[in-house]
């Protein structure tokens, strides 16, 4: 996909207002794109999560089973009216009829005297919705609307290129309050047991990760380490596709790969490095999040390559095992010498 085609997709989805349990505008934007794609079928679960399936039959019209599911969440930390429940700090904004509680994590200092914009039963920080400046996307909610837009863009890219194969896109709710949507979706029985689920995120920039150095092969998060075989496979596909990637832990937070992995799914992670995580700028000032447009473009290309990859399951593991075994054989005679 060209950058020129990618930009309006990003702008349309990332600009939508959202908060935990109030993801409707983002869901509508996603569905608006997907309904135009003849080879993408969409269904939802009873909790409002969205499951999209791309499938274009192979030679002879034989069915194709999806090997990968790409997952992203549709919410972002925000102020929410939750009647008769106290789920977080509560604030009565000027002119508002009801107090609102903040759902999602930010330092307590960032919650003092916030400037917000209301959307009925929820509110977001009063920040620019989407701007592209000097190669960086500055937005009110990169996390994780960028991930949602990447999946949509991947589907469009697969459709435009008439790619044969199948994959899933998972768009979930209420990640910011403890991976709630992903946990419910993982137990729904709607995702094939043998699929590899790849969590797509924007993750707080921490060394050695660097904004602008390409998409990141995320080996784990704050809570867990992801599947080694799946991670090796993604690294192999990236190399074969000539897409430069960074390889980092990214421990700034926990992502949905942890939830799916705990449910028994083989899970992996991809992300782009994020500035001003959860809108927390210098000196606890609220500020737009930002990511590299080039990193996002690279992530779309990588996801499309993964979706149609013919790399066999565990092929990368077998290759590594063979390489190490041959190397050990090379030095076998030296082991006979006394240390």
Language-model-derived ranges and their functions:
Residues 1-339:
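N-terminal hydrophobic/helix-forming segments and targeting peptides
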């Amino acid at each position: 996909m060209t950058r020129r085609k990618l930009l309006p997709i990003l702008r349309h989805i990332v600009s939508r207002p959202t908060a935990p349990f109030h993801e409707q505008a983002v869901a509508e934007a996603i569905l608006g794109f997907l309904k135009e794609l003849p080879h993408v079928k969409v269904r939802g679960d009873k909790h409002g999560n969205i499951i999209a399936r791309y499938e274009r039959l192979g030679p002879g019209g034989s069915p194709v089973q999806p090997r990968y599911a790409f997952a992203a969440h549709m919410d972002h930390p925000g102020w929410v009216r939750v009647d008769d429940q106290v789920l977080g700090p509560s604030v009565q904004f000027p002119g508002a009829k009801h107090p609102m509680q903040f759902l999602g994590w930010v330092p307590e200092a960032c919650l003092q005297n916030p400037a917000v914009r209301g959307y009925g039963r929820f509110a977001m920080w009063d920040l620019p919705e989407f701007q592209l400046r000097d190669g960086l996307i500055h937005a009110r909610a990169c996390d994780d609307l960028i991930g949602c837009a990447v999946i949509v863009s991947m589907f469009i890219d697969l459709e435009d290129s008439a790619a044969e194969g199948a994959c899933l896109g998972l768009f979930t709710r209420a990640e910011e309050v403890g991976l709630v949507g992903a946990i419910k979706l993982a137990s729904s029985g709607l995702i094939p047991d043998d699929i590899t689920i790849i969590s797509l995120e924007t993750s707080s920039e921490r060394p050695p990760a660097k904004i602008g150095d390409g998409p990141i092969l995320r080996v784990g998060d704050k809570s867990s380490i992801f599947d080694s075989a799946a991670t090796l496979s993604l690294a192999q596909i990236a190399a074969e596709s000539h897409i430069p990637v960074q390889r980092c832990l990214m421990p700034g937070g926990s992502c949905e790969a942890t939830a799916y992995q705990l449910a028994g799914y083989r899970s992996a992670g991809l992300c782009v490095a994020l500035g001003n995580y959860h809108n927390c700028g210098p000196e606890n000032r609220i500020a737009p999040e930002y990511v590299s447009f080039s990193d996002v473009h690279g992530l779309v290309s990588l996801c499309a390559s993964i979706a149609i990859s013919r790399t066999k399951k565990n092929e990368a593991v077998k290759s590594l095992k063979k390489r190490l075994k041959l190397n050990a054989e090379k030095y076998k005679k030296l082991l006979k010498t006394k240390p």
